[in-house]
Amino acid sequence: MTVPSKTIAPKTLYQKVWDAHIVATPEGEAPIIYVDRHLVHEVTSPQAFSGLKVAGRQLRAPEKTFATMDHNTSTRSASLDALSPMARIQVETLAQNCKDFGVLLYDIHHPNQGIVHVMGPELGITLPGTVIVCGDSHTATHGAFGALAFGIGTSEVEHVLATQTLRQLKAKTMKIEVRGQVTDGVTAKDIVLAIIGKIGMDGGTGYVVEFCGEAIEALSMEGRMTVCNMAIEMGAKAGMVAPDQTTFDYLEGREFAPKGEDWAQAVAEWKTLKTDVGAEFDATVVLDAADIAPQLTWGTNPGQVVAIDAPVPNPADEVNPTIRSSMEKALDYIGLTAGTPMTEVAINKVFIGSCTNSRIEDLRSAAKHAKGRKVAAGVTAIVVPGSGQVKAQAEAEGLDKIFIEAGFEWRLPGCSMCLAMNDDRLEAGDRCASTSNRNFEGRQGRGSRTHLVSPAMAAAAAIAGHFVDIRKPY
């Protein structure tokens, strides 16, 4: 008798990584998944470590936990004296906790210190097919490598430290395909802002998104990280890009990446991490890359975004009363009038940095627009590299000199002006061209007005004193 062969259903990239990490699925409960890498920083970890101490527990796998100081650190000085009292307590507490529990720490004096989502990938801590968590909402950044990466809360941070596992419900799957190639002046930041503008800030809620298509495949790893970084801004649990030769070339030789024979074996396994032909997604979104222009936000959430050659939207044109009301509120806060060309919106602050856009490719892009020019009168512009490695490389290439000669401030690594949690913040009424990921009310300081843009658009705005279409002479 012939026994029929068992057919294996085609799987998405997310399903493959998910299935490989299930530890147990207790009846009536959420599955328990294994965590390969745990990244911690000074803001969301103190209570977690305290919980371990109270319970008398040790770390389940200290060698899989990596710590850095980034959110509250000063970008003006590496001295503890430059920190606010609360920030100093947090960084000193992290240092003590890492010492007590045997966790590798990249403190403010370490040459590789930086934003957790910048230094993790550049050190090779981030690897394809792994599950990565961090007490930070932009952990999705690491999904650019084909990892399943997402943010967790402080109680979950403690649970991972103690068990190296998490209870998680399986998410739905969404494919976002960007077909064709972008035109000159359009970057990864513009791609992801266009996506969010299309599906809204809650369009990805409940999903893990896989970004694909020719435009995504053409991106560098830096660009893919920018796209995945903002998956949370469309409401998604995580964002992923299938690993390919671009991924392998980026990772080879990095400190924590496999070496020798292990490298060859790892690459062979990573090459299987792609969505199978015939695998079904719960939702699919398609964009034509050629239709994407440089983007910038006009309102108070990342979904309120338009192309640079468009005017400020008019709420009166919106038929949905809830959306119309939100638009009216946003315009009132942001201080713009419907119908105003975005190229006529003046700015007085520029921030180039954050876990979205502070990598070497981002700084090179901004420097092209700053070279040989001067920051406009009345504009304060700062450039904050994402890590010590990025800073050193930029300085080796002379990018720091280009920025400084143009009138930009060249800073130390850190989260900086992305959030009003350190000494880099906006004053009420300031209008900022920012390469960060959130433009919520008060995000960069009480009463501040934030417009999300690419590094090239931010640098150009600093020079012109207002937003410009970088595809044209200015």
Swiss-Prot record:
Uppermost EC category: lyase
Entry keywords, A to Z: 4Fe-4S, Amino-acid biosynthesis, Branched-chain amino acid biosynthesis, Iron, Iron-sulfur, Leucine biosynthesis, Lyase, Metal-binding
Catalytic activity reported: (2R,3S)-3-isopropylmalate = (2S)-2-isopropylmalate
A Pfam entry, by short name: Aconitase
Entries under CDD domains matching the protein: IPMI
GO biological process, one term: L-leucine biosynthetic process
Subunit structure: Heterodimer of LeuC and LeuD.
Protein task: Catalyzes the isomerization between 2-isopropylmalate and 3-isopropylmalate, via the formation of 2-isopropylmaleate.
Protein name: 3-isopropylmalate dehydratase large subunit
